[in-house]
Structures are given as C-alpha cells and as structure tokens.
C-alpha cells in the first residue's frame, strides 16, 4: 500500500473555489487598508449564493456570511463532538470525519465523508488495522493519506492509551499502523497535528491530569523503513506552557498555536515555532484579542486566521468569530452576524475554497444541533469603519455604496437582534408612514388587499425563524387580532407602561427608538395595482374590495393557524376564530418563556411595544379615514337635503296649478317640461339619498366596528400589560429562586471543588499506581520475551547438552576418583615433606652430635694417648686401673648413646603426631575438595595441586641438592680417611716398632669414622623412604596419565571439542611434571647408589687386615683394638650390646 504525500502549499493561501459557489471578482487583500480599530466592513458588491433555489421556493439571497447547508444523511452523523477532521477539503469537495462522541454519548470509530458538491454524508467501510473508538484525537490529510494519532481510547483509568500512528489510504480505504522504532510519544488527547515539509508535528495534549508541551516530529519520507521513528524537537529556548484543547496551523513554513488550557488557566496567546532556528517565539498582536478559551476551531484562508467558538474559563460555551491577519498581526472581531451558529466547543472548521465549513460541536445541556454551517469569508473586508457608541447598531455593516438600506440588510439587522422579521413580496421603503400621511391618503388605502407573508430568510429551515401571522387592515375585529410566534429567547424586560401609554403616533415611536439607540423593526406593505384602481371607483366597489380583502385575510389567518395549531384546523368561521384568539395568545405566551429563555427581556418588551404601536397606528389611521368619510357623507347628505327642500317649492306650485289655475298653452308646455325635469331630478336625488343613507349606515357600522376593535385592542393591551406585570412578578420570583439556587450552587460548588480535590489526589495516586503497573507490565513483557528467547535457545541447546551431560557425568565421576587419588597423593606428599623436615632436624641434631663426638673423641684420644704413654712408660699395676678407666669412659659413651637413641625415639613420636595432624588436615582438605563438582574448577584445582606438588618437588630437589652437597663432603671426608688409613698402613709396614704413633692415629681417627658411618646409615634409610614414596607417586602419576589419555581418546570421537584443549594442556603439563619427577627419582637412585657404594667402601675398609710385624703381644693388642673399633662401627649401625665383651674380662 503506497501513499502519495502531496501537499499543495498554496492551498492554505490560495484555495480553489468549490463548484457550488459563484463568487464575483473581489479586490485583493493588498488593496485593503489596515486599521488599528477592531471593526469589519462587509462588501455588498459581492453576493455569494451557496445554495441557489428557485424564487418560488421561498429562499432568498441574504447579506449574512453564515448560512446553513442542507445535507442528506446528517442524522446518522450529527450531533457529534470531539471528532477529528482536516483543515482543507480534498479537492475542495470532500471532508473526512473520524470518531468522536455521537448522540448516544459513546465514542465511535466510524468514518464519514461529506461531499460538498452533492451535499451528502457517506459512510466509508474501511479495512486493515482500524483504530479503536476514541475522542479528542487529532488528524490531518496529506495527499491520499488521512493520518490519525492519539485520543482518549481507554474505558478505564488503568487501561493504557493508544500511542500508535494510523494512516488511511483514501484511494483503497485501508488502514495501516505505522511501524516506528525507538521511543514513541505517550498516548494523549486534546493535542494537534500539523505538517511542516515532509514531517508531521505533534504538540501538546493531556493525559488525565498531566499536560504536555513537547514537540515531536515524524518524517513521512521514512515511513515503513528502518529509519521510521519519532524524534523530539530540541528547542533552544523555553517552549510554550503545557496545554490542551488548542489549535495549530502552519503558515509560511512556520507552526502556530493559539489558545488552550492547562486545567487551571485558559490561554489566548499566539506562539510561533521556527523550524530553521528550532526556537519558539510569542507573537505580539494588536487589536481586540479573543477571550481565553479552549476547544475552539480555526482555519486559515488567504493569510487570515478565523477562530470560532470554544469554551471560556467559566465553562460557558462561545459562538463569537474572530479574524487575525497574519501579515499585520492584527485581531478583528466579527460581531453581530446574522444566522450565527449556537455556542459550542469541540467542533471542526474545514476550508473549502473561500468558504469555511463548521461541523458538529458540544453545546449546553439539552441542546443539540444537526446542521452544517458555512461561512463565506469573501464577504469580509477588514477595513477602517467608524465604530458605534453605546447600543447603536452598525448599520453601515449592511449598507451598500449609495447608503440605501436594502430589505435583506434590514432583515439581517433584525436577525442579529434576534427579533422576528417580516418581508413583503416587494419592499419600496423602510420608513414608517406618519399619521398625517395616513389621513391625507385616498380611500384606496382603506381598500388595500392583504399581502402575502414572506418565508424566513434564505429559506433554509423554517423552524429557526417562523413567520408570525400579520394582521390585515380590514374592518373585521377578528382580523385585527394578531397571533404572535417568536423565534427568539426571553430576557430582561423593562417597565415601559408609561412610555406605551404616552405616545401612540409614529413620530413619538421614532423618537423613542432614536433615544434608545436602536432601529425598530418595521412592516412595509405595498398595495396592489388592482386595489389602487378600485380606490378611484365608487363607494360600492370600495365596499366590495373591503369585503374581498377581509375574506382573503381571514382565509390566510386560517391557513396559518391550521399549520401552527393543527387541532384548530376545523374552525373556519370568523366567530370561531375570535373564540380561539385567547387560546392562541395564551399558547404563544407560554411558549415564550419555555423556548426563548436566552434573549434579553428588554428586547422582548421592545418588540411587544413596536408591534403594539404598529397595531394602534394602523387602527388610528383607519379611524381617521372613516371619520373623514363620515364627514364627507354628512356634507353630501346636508346638501341633498337642502336641494330637496328647494325642490319642494316648485312642486307645490305645480300642485296648485293642477288644482284649477290655467294659463296660456305656451306657458303650460314650458312649465310641464320644467316639471318633468324637476320630477326626474327629484327621483334621482331620492335614489341618491337612499344610497347615502345606506352608505351612512355602513359607515356607522364600520365606525362601530372600528371603535369596537379599538376597544378590543385596548383590552388586549391592558391584558398584555397585566401579563407583563405577571411576567415581571414571575421573573422576580424566578430571580429569587435563581438566587437561592445560586447560593445552593455555590455550596454545591464548594463541595464539588472539595470532591474534585479529593478526586485529583485519588487520580494522582491512581496514576502513580497505573504508571508503576505499566512499568511492571513493560518489564514483565520484556522478561517474558527474554524468557521465551531463552527457552527457545535452551530447547535448541538441550539436544547438544544431553550428550555433553552424559560425558560430563562420566568425566565428573572419574574426576571425583582422580580428586580422591590426588588428595591421597597430596597427603602422602605432605607426609614425605614432614619426614624430610624431620630428617632435616635429625640431621641438624646429628651434626651437633658430630661436633660433640669430635670434641669427646679428641678428649678420649688425648686420654688414650696419655694412658698409652703411661702404660708404655709405667708398670703393669696401673694397667688395670687404666683399663677400668677406659671401661668407665666406654660406659659413659654408651649412656650418651642411649640418651641420643631416646632423643631419636622422641623425634619419631613427634613425627608420628605430626603425621596424624597432617592426615586430619588432609582429610579436611579432601572434604572441601569434594564440594567442587564443576569440571573447570576441578581442573583448576588439579592444576593448582600439581603446581603445589611441583613446588614441593622443587623444595625436595633443593633438599636433595643439600644432601648431595653433604654427601660430597662426606665422600671427601671418607677419602681423607682412606688416605689416613693408607698412610698408617704404610707407616706400619715401614716402621712396625712405632706402635704408639699408629695407635694414636687410630684412636684419633676412629670416632669420626664411626660418626660418618652412622650418618651414612641414617642417610641411606631416609633415601630409601623417599625412594619408596616417589615410586608410589610415580605409579599414581602413570595411572593418571593413562586415564587422561583414555579420556582424550573418547573426546576425539565426539563433535564437540570444547574440552579437548584444556585436557591436552593438562596432559602436557602433567607429562612434563612426570618427567621432572622421573628425573628426581633417577637422581635419588644415583644418590642412593653412591651412598651404598660409600657404605660398602667403609665396610671394605673395616674388613681390611692391617699387616703386623711386631711381637705377638703387641699384635694381639692391636687385634683387640681393631675388634673394638669394629664393635664401635657395628654399634653405629645397630644398637650396641649392653654387656661388655668377653675379651675385656680377659684383658
């Protein structure tokens, strides 16, 4: 579906004229003179005939710019308010109407089109995404796109407002919802939509009690694209105050807004938005600006803004019309226009050429209007005309160039004052004839026929201005009784009884009208040519004419009464009509108060006075004419009587002659002819007298009828005055009642204000809750969407995760086993570390003991040397003592050795306790490690454990290095001992007699040899333990390496290789660690081999036999010494015997 966004920029300034309008050429607006006075002059040189009908139908060309358009099918559309339309008709012919509140007080979403060419409403059945029922929305027509946004769409406060943009293709009648990315303006109502270039601009509006003043734009060129979005206009200065119910329009590529309300204040300011500068500015205006209002309608025609209606701050509906010239920034008030529509708000005003079309609107309670009104803007000329002061009407508004008042203008003036008007078929003069003119007129004025009553102006709807029955100038009293029917509303009435009774002539009436500053309505009747011709005839023809006029007037009154009062249509006689006059008058007076309560009472009183003056004036003129006729008839009668008296004298003479007096023949003939002539004249005079008597009797009857009718009129005037007095009393009572009602209303208003304040507080809280609920809904919707996406993804990944979960379960089980094994290995490593630490302590103790042994051995050697010297030099008596001393020393050394063994046992006990504590700590660590079930964490823990094992291996390696250094020192010392032994053997071979030196060397060197032998044994034991631990560790690592290889082989067959890389990395790291452990084990093996080799060498040295070349005794002694040394060496490897050897006893 494609839209053609064609915007005729000239349509707002140079509109095309519709087909139904025929307008003559008018001067351009540039030729008009502007004025600072707020007045208007209407051009009478141009008359636009909106709906031209035949003259026989009763329609008339009116001077009012307002007119009604008779539309077919309007009952289905109107009354309606808060609907949406567009400012300019499509092609000058069609106006689209959407939504609003109809007569059933329910929001609608129906679509109608008004065709101005055919004057018909047509319902359009649309398809697609039709907007929901709404009111207070905004719309605009651009090309073939009818665009709708916003409106009050929710039926509940908690519901969410619709903030979508809807587009209707007027060619295909298909609705489409615009897809806009990003943020959207919030739903609202009472806003406006305008077009600036290719963008539609949204301004203002309200949402419950919050009013907006943001300007949001939507580019139609980006419709249905990825760039389709709403953009908030960044304004450089402060925008207008927030408002709703305003009007907006574009002119010269600028956006204007006028009026509106923010709930508390009503505005009448005009603001302009400059899109190039992106700034707002308040327009300074001149002239009389409209009152602050909201809910009004406006449209622009040829650079002039027309504003109509709305609702004021006090809640009253308005029907005033204002014009604003955008070039001069001047306001004009177009006041006192006839046929102005009733007050209303929430209506629409569309432009079709030079004509504005008013549709719908909300009115007061009980008021409804189903009419479509049209305003012809070509009738206005915004020029300089002097204004009138006081209550004087601006008659120049309806005057032509010559200054003569035409009937339509006069009719319009009456309509503007809401007094019913009367039009004759031909009107020659609007001035009232004076009483002297009536007296000086001929008898033909008395013979005028009853004129035809004109239909209402323009012939639109007779129910708006019904024509009252006009009384004729007949002699019949029934004809002189008028029946009144007003189409105006009742208002204030003044007490004008003194004025009514003081002046009855036309001069006084005109003076009163001039004093009051008003032009009184007039009735002007023109006599027909037939009645004019018969006015010059005889008295008999005049009587016939009067009788004919009377019968026609009676028939006309009966016809009108049959239309007005159907129940009285059977009454056709004059007597029956007389009986109905009171009923008609009572009915019409009762309807005055009911139907026309809005008109001022002063205007009703003035209207009654004018009608009463007209009736009295007509009756006075009739009475004057009758008196003149009576005077003429009496004069003719007197003349005839005189002539008859004079004729009686020759008649008497003729009678005397006939009695007996005779004359000559000639004289007799002459006299006979004279008598015959006289007799003929007498006969004619007699007939004339009879006619005069008849006429005088008729005149007497007419005079009596006239006097009776005058009396009846006086009675009627008195009754009218009584009714006026009663009406004033009613008015006073009603005014008192109104005051009481106003006081009650004020109290109620206070209560209502309090309730409104409470309602406002409640609505604020409800709005907060609704806002929070909307946020919660949005968040929940987002959460639901994310959950749906996650469920979809989870469903997609479940199939993949099944196999992974199975493999992970197997891996986890195996990994748990590995973790347990690693924990055991770690515990064993901790134990080995503790053993190594204990061995280090023992080694330190051994070094300390070694130093002590060296000192003790030095002392013992020194003592042995001294004793040997003594033995050699001394006698044998001292040998036993010496031997005993040696035995004592040996015992002391054995005791010391036992102490040291106890210390070693204590260290072993401490080592066992430490091992148990380490085992408990290891069990705690294993329990903590079993809580980790994630594969990555377990791998990381394994890596950390391997790193710790490596650190421990490094520390063990360092200790091994230290042991190697100690072993190297021990080997060097062993080499030194070998050298010493070799030197001693060589010395014995060279000088076998020098036993003392050899013995001293042996005594001096046996203790360090014993110590070294003992250290080597301890070192061999520790190395064997370490070798066994590293063997177990190597076995475990080889098993673990095989397990990892099996896992890698399993994972290679599967597609997902997400776990291969870390396993390969772990495998490579562990293989490197295993290699390093293997190297350590090989080093330990080599070290143990070297130690074993050293031990074997020591044993070989111990087993070697030294050559002896001395005597037998000395050889025996040397042998005993060597055996003793062997025993010492054996005591270093194992516990020495507690008892002394046998050879000691022998010695």
UniProtKB/Swiss-Prot annotation:
Biased composition (Basic residues): 1-16
Superkingdom, taxonomy of origin: Eukaryota
Annotated GO CC locations: cell cortex of cell tip; cell division site; cell tip; cytoplasmic microtubule; cytoplasmic microtubule plus-end; division septum; growing cell tip; microtubule cytoskeleton
UniProt feature coiled coil, ranges: 611-649, 716-838, 879-990, 1084-1105
Subcellular location: Cytoplasm, Cytoskeleton
SMART domains: Kelch
Phosphoserine carried by residues: 503
Gene Ontology molecular function, alphabetical: protein-membrane adaptor activity
Keywords attached to this entry: Coiled coil, Cytoplasm, Cytoskeleton, Kelch repeat, Microtubule, Phosphoprotein, Repeat
Transmembrane regions: none
Low complexity bias locations: 502-512
Polar residues: bias regions: 18-32, 385-403, 408-465, 472-489, 519-547
Region (Disordered): 1-64, 384-403, 408-547
Region described as Retention at microtubule cell ends: spans on this chain: 948-1147
Biological process, per Gene Ontology: establishment or maintenance of bipolar cell polarity; protein localization to cell cortex of cell tip
Residue ranges, annotated region (Interaction with tea4): 538-1147
Kelch repeats: 94-144, 146-198, 199-253, 254-303, 305-351, 355-402
Subunit-level organization: Major component of the tea1 cell-end complex. Interacts with rax2, tea4 and tip1. Interacts with for3 in the presence of tea4.
Name recorded for this polypeptide: Tip elongation aberrant protein 1
Originating species: Schizosaccharomyces pombe (strain 972 / ATCC 24843)
């Amino acid at each position: 579906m494609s839209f053609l966004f064609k915007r005729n920029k000239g349509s707002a300034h140079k509109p095309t004229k519709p087909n139904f309008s025929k307008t003559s050429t008018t001067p351009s607006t540039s030729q008009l003179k502007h004025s600072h006075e707020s007045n208007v002059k209407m051009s009478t040189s141009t008359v636009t005939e909106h709906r031209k009908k035949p003259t026989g139908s009763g329609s008339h060309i009116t001077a009012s710019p307002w007119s009604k358009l008779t539309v077919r099918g309007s009952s289905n559309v109107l009354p309606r308010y808060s609907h949406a339309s567009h400012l300019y008709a499509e092609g000058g012919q069609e106006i689209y109407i959407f939504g609003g509140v109809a007569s059933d007080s329910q929001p609608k979403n129906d679509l109608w089109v008004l065709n101005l060419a055919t004057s018909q409403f047509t319902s359009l059945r649309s398809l697609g995404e039709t907007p929901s029922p709404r009111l207070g929305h905004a719309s605009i027509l651009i090309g073939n796109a009818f665009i709708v946004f916003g409106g009050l769409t929710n039926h509940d406060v908690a519901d969410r407002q619709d903030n979508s943009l809807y587009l209707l293709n007027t060619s295909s009648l298909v609705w489409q919802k615009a897809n806009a990315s990003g943020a959207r303006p919030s739903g609202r109502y009472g806003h406006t939509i305008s077009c600036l270039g290719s963008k539609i601009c949204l301004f203002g509006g309200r949402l419950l009690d919050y009013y907006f003043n943001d300007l949001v734009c939507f580019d139609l060129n980006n419709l249905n694209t990825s760039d389709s979005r709403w953009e908030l206009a960044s304004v450089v200065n402060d925008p207008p105050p927030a408002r709703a119910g305003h009007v907006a329009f574009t002119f010269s590529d600028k956006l204007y807004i006028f009026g509106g309300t923010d709930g508390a204040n009503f505005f009448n300011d005009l603001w302009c938005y400059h899109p190039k500068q992106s700034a707002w500015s308040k327009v300074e205006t001149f002239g009389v600006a409209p009152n602050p209002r909201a809910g009004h309608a406006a449209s622009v025609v040829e650079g002039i803004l027309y504003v109509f209606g709305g609702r004021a701050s006090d809640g009253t509906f308005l029907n005033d019309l204002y014009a604003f010239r955008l070039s001069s920034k001047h306001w004009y008030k177009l006041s006192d226009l006839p046929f102005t529509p009733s007050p209303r708000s929430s209506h629409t005003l569309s432009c079709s050429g030079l004509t504005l079309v008013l549709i719908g609107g909300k009115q007061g309670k009980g008021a409804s209007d189903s009419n479509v009104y049209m305003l012809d803007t070509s009738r206005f000329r915004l020029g300089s005309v002097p204004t009138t002061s006081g209550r004087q009407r601006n008659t120049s508004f309806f005057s032509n160039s010559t200054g003569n008042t035409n009937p339509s203008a006069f009719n319009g003036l009456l309509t503007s004052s809401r007094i019913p008007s009367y039009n004759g078929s031909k009107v020659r003069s609007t001035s009232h004839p004076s009483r002297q003119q009536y007296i000086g007129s001929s008898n033909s004025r008395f013979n005028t026929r009853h004129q035809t009553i004109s239909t209402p102006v323009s012939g639109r709807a007779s129910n708006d201005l019904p024509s009252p029955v006009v009384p004729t100038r007949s002699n019949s009293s029934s004809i002189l009784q008028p029946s009144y029917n007003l189409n105006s509303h009742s208002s204030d009435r003044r007490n004008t009884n003194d004025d009514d009774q003081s002046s009855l002539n036309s001069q006084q009436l005109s003076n009163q009208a001039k004093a009051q500053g008003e032009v009184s309505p007039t009735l002007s009747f023109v006599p027909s040519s037939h009645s004019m011709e018969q006015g010059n005839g005889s008295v008999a023809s005049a009587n016939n004419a009067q009788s004919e006029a009377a019968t026609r007037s009676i028939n006309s009154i009966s016809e009108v009464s049959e239309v007005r009062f159907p129940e009285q249509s059977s009454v056709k006689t004059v007597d029956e009509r007389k009986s109905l006059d009171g009923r008609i008058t009572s009915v019409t007076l009762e309807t005055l108060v009911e139907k026309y309560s809005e008109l001022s009472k002063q205007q009703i009183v003035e209207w009654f006075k004018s009608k009463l003056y007209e009736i009295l004036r007509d009756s006075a003129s009739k009475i004057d004419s009758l008196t003149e006729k009576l005077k003429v008839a009496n004069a003719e009668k007197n003349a005839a009587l005189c002539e008859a008296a004079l004729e009686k004298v020759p008649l008497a003479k003729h009678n005397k002659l006939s009695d007996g007096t005779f004359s000559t023949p000639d004289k007799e003939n002459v006299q006979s002819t004279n008598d015959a002539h006289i007799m003929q004249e007498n006969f004619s005079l007699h007939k004339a007298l009879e006619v005069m008597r008849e006429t005088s009797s008729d005149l007497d009857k007419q005079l009596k009828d006239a006097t009776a009718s005058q009396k009846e009129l006086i009675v009627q005037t008195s009754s009218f005055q009584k009714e006026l007095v009663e009406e004033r009393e009613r008015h006073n009572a009603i005014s008192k009642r109104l005051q009481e009602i106003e006081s009650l209303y004020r109290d109620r208003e206070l209560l209502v204000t309090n309730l409104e304040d409470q309602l406002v507080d409640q609505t604020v809280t409800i709005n907060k809750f609704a806002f929070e609920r909307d946020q919660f809904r949005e968040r929940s919707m987002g959460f639901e969407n994310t959950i749906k996406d996650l469920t979809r993804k989870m469903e997609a990944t479940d199939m993949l995760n099944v196999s992974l979960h199975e493999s992970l379960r197997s891996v986890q089980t195996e990994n748990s086993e590995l973790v347990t094994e690693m924990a055991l290995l770690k515990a064993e490593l901790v134990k080995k570390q503790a053993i190594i630490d204990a061995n280090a302590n023992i080694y330190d103790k051994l070094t300390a003991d070694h130093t002590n042994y060296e000192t003790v051995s030095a002392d013992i050697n020194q003592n042995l040397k001294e004793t040997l010297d003594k033995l050699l030099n001394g006698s044998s008596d001292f040998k036993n003592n010496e031997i005993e001393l040696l035995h004592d020393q040996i015992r002391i050394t054995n005791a010391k050795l036992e102490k040291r063994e106890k210390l070693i046992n204590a260290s072993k006990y401490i080592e066992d306790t430490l091992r148990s504590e380490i085992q408990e700590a290891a069990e705690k660590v294993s329990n903590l490690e079993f809580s980790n079930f994630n594969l990555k964490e377990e791998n990381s823990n394994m890596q950390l454990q391997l790193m710790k094992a490596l650190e421990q291996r490094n520390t063990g390696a360092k200790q091994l290095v230290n042991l190697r250094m100690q072993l190297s020192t021990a080997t060097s010392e062993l080499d030194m001992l070998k050298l010493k032994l070799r030197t001693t053997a060589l010395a014995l071979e060279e000088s076998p007699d020098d036993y003392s030196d050899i013995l001293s060397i042996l005594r001096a060197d046996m203790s360090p040899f014993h110590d070294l032998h003992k250290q080597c044994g301890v070192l061999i034991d520790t190395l064997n333990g370490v070798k066994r631990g590293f063997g177990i560790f190597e076995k475990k690592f080889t098993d673990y390496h095989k397990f990892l290889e099996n896992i890698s082989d399993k994972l290679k067959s599967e597609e997902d290789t997400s776990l291969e890389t870390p396993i390969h990395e772990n495998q490579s790291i562990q293989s490197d660690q295993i290699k390093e452990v293997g190297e350590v084990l090989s080093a330990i093996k080599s070290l143990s081999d070297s130690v074993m080799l050293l031990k074997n060498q020591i044993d070989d040295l111990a087993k070697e036999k030294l050559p002896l070349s001395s005597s037998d005794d000395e050889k025996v002694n040397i042998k005993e010494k060597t055996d003793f040394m062997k025993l010492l060496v054996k005591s270093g490897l194992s516990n020495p015997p507690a008892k002394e050897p046998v050879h000691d006893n022998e010695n």
